[in-house]
Amino acid sequence: MRIEVWQGDITQLDVDVIVNAANESLLGGGGVDGAIHRAAGPRLLEACEALPEVRPGVRCPTGEIRITDGFDLKARHIFHTVGPVWRDGKHNEPEQLANCYWQSLKLAEQMMLHSIAFPAISCGIYGYPLYQAARIAVTETRDWQRSHKVPKHIVLVAYNEATYKAYHQALATQETAAA
């Protein structure tokens, strides 16, 4: 079992599932969400539109997961999750972000998926501080692997050098604390 930090385009990874940092409508947007929609092709939008709304305009509330096929991606599945919008860290943002990772891992285990790739959820337009988000991503994935066998391979995908460094710093900090 391993956690890997990888810098590049999440849509190019050959994994069982990629996690999409989506918005509540699941109809595509900017950042990684837009990149995934473009790479997966028009059938992804059709699949997302077919998902039921839980309230007007909302197909996936913050912290929850919705599943679609990967369509034109190498990944067989896409887990769409909505991370929190950063306000000040005092409105359950850390718990909501942690839940995005934990629920994705739980669903991957239930589906017996062996590899999963995460973007830096909430770190784009949602404004989550990068180092705090990286620490949560590393904590949740490490904690998961301590008590579960699947998925065996977790990839934390950095879209730029700053994110790559933040993930590595979070991993190093946890390794030092564990020693």
From Swiss-Prot:
SUPFAM superfamilies given in the database record: Macro domain-like
GO MF entries: O-acetyl-ADP-ribose deacetylase activity
Source taxon at top rank: Bacteria
Domain named Macro: residues: 1-175
CDD domains: Macro_OAADPr_deacetylase
NCBIfam families, alphabetized: PRK00431.1-2, PRK00431.1-6
Family: Belongs to the MacroD-type family.
Protein name: Macro domain-containing protein XCC3184
Lineage: Bacteria, Pseudomonadati, Pseudomonadota, Gammaproteobacteria, Lysobacterales
